[in-house]
Each structure stands twice: as structure tokens, then as C-alpha cells.
Amino acid sequence: MNILEEIAVRTRVRIAEEEAAKPLAQLRKEAEALWEKELAQGVNLPLKPLQEEAGESSAKNSAEAGGRPGRYRFYRALQKEGMSYICEVKKASPSKGLIAKEFPYVKIAKEYELAGAAAVSCLTEPYYFKGSDDYLREIAETISIPVLRKDFTVNSYMIYEAKLLGAAAILLICAILDDEQLVEYLKLADSLGLDALVEAHDAEEVERALK
């Protein structure tokens, strides 16, 4: 078992514990209600081609229509002219250990925004990267640029959770997901107004990501 697989296994245990405290049905209801509220307020609507390509008149029907995933805040932020940077807020990593003992995560995110970052990536994995859901929530509430939840998405629970934490996008890693999961999670993210950053490590995974 490599480190990525090890983290994925630990993440499944962690999310099972969270789901025991807050059932999936409840989390899903809250996340869908938040997206409905955003739609009603005209917040974070997808780029126009979404409806045209999906053949639907409503953004929330795009995933069910099987059309191209929506392009929301995170996608749009990276479409600006010139180089676009996704700047990371990370306290630790398995390879480097503790990176920052003092970790003013909100201050770091604000400095990234002031420096011209297109988006911020926030680690929420607590055991190997010393991340926290609270880091993401507070950063998303403070800065105006979109925030990617950088975690090891292993099930739908984490996608609903990301929505409620204020993330604009989720990370999907090809190496820990099969093709069916990739499609399912991309559609689910789209149905909640979330973009997805798909991580691929080799040519085969790139092909899978582009299907």
C-alpha cells in the first residue's frame, strides 16, 4: 500500500465517523438547500454554454441531462488572461512533516488574494496534512476568490460537506477513484454548483479524466 492509498483508507474511516454523527441524508438536504438558495439569488451561476450544451434551461438539471459539467466560480477564476495561480494553504505534509508551526491560515489566504492569486487551495485532511474543515470555512468566509477543498475525496459525503464548508471546488484524484466514481462525483459536484479539479499522475489517468 502506497502513501496515497494509506491516506484514502484513513479518510474512509474518518468520514464514516463523521457520517455516524451527521447522516448523509441530512447533509445532502442542507447542501441542496444551499445550492437552491444560490440559484434563487443568482449567485454562482454557470457559464452560458452549460445550458446550451446540456439542452436544458436550468443549471441544476445539467448533471441529469448528461451535458458538459458547469463552469462555476473556480473555473471562471482560472479563465482570466495571463498566468493563473492556485495558491495553497498547507500546515504539513507526509513528505516534509510540519511546515508551519505557527499557522495564521486566514492571513496567509488573504495575502495570496492580495498578491493576485486566482484561487486558494486549502488542505482539510487532518491526520497527514494537519488540515481542518474550520480552516476552509473561515478562509471562504473571509476572501473573495474561490477556494478549493484539497482533500482525498472518497465518497459523496465529502462533496456535500465541501459545499456546506464554502468550497467552490473539490479535488478528485484518479489514482484512488475508479471510472464510475469519477463520473458520479463530477456529476454530483456539478449538481451542487461546484467545480472539480481532477488530478492525474500519468497518461493513462489523463485519458480517464478526459472521458
Each predicted region: which residue ranges?
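An N-cap/entry alpha-helix motif that binds or orients negatively charged groups
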Residues: 2-55, 59-100
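Structural preference for beta-strand elements that scaffold enzyme active sites
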Residues: 6, 84-88, 119, 146-148, ...
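Active-site beta-loop-alpha junctions enriched in small/polar residues
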Residues: 10, 90-92, 125, 152-153, ...
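Glycine-rich, proline-tolerant flexible connector loops at the mouths of alpha/beta enzymes
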Residues: 32, 69, 93-99, 119-138
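Alpha-helix-loop-beta-strand connector modules within alpha/beta enzyme cores
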Residues: 72, 81, 130-152, 183-198
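Active-site mouth loops of central-metabolism enzymes
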Residues: 89-104, 146-154, 197-199
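Alpha/beta enzyme core
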Residues: 101-120, 142, 159-168, 182-185, ...
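Glycine- and Gly-Pro-enriched alpha-helical subdomains that act as flexible
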Residues: 124, 138, 145-158, 164-165, ...
